[in-house]
Amino acid sequence: VIVLDTNIILALLDKKDAHHKNAVGIIEDLGNERVYVLNTNLSEIYSVIARRCRERKYDCKEALGKLKELEANINIIWLENMQEIHAELADGVIESNGELNYNDVLLLKFVRDEEAKLITFDKQLKVENQRIRGGQA
């Protein structure tokens, strides 16, 4: 299982993103591999795109509409029963001294538990992902 972080999708959709070309290359390199996004990351993507549109005075409906269209080609993992793991996630944010946000801790927990591959541009997430895997990417 390959899981994409929020920043990969954002960079893919936003041609002005510093990582746009890298994101396109990553997706092209994956070819026909099935990739997944957690529903929590999807909600984060919607929020960031809406904010960027407002800041840049772009048409939010058009940009968000493109994201909704992209959903048809993304495998979304719908996490439920978050109440059961909330304390663990909150502790992860606290233990990282705020270096990781709640969604980051959730994403790391998922890739650890499911032995999934994480693709991200976030250096801190990469470091933490390697740490929890015992040095393996």
Where is each model-derived feature located?
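Short, well-structured N-terminal submotif of metal-dependent ribonuclease cores
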Residues: 1-37, 52-65
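Aromatic- and histidine-enriched alpha-helix N-cap/loop-to-helix transition segments
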Residues: 37-43, 102, 106
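Acidic catalytic patch
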Residues: 15, 39-43, 65-96
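Amphipathic alpha-helical repeat scaffolds of TPR domains
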Residues: 46-47
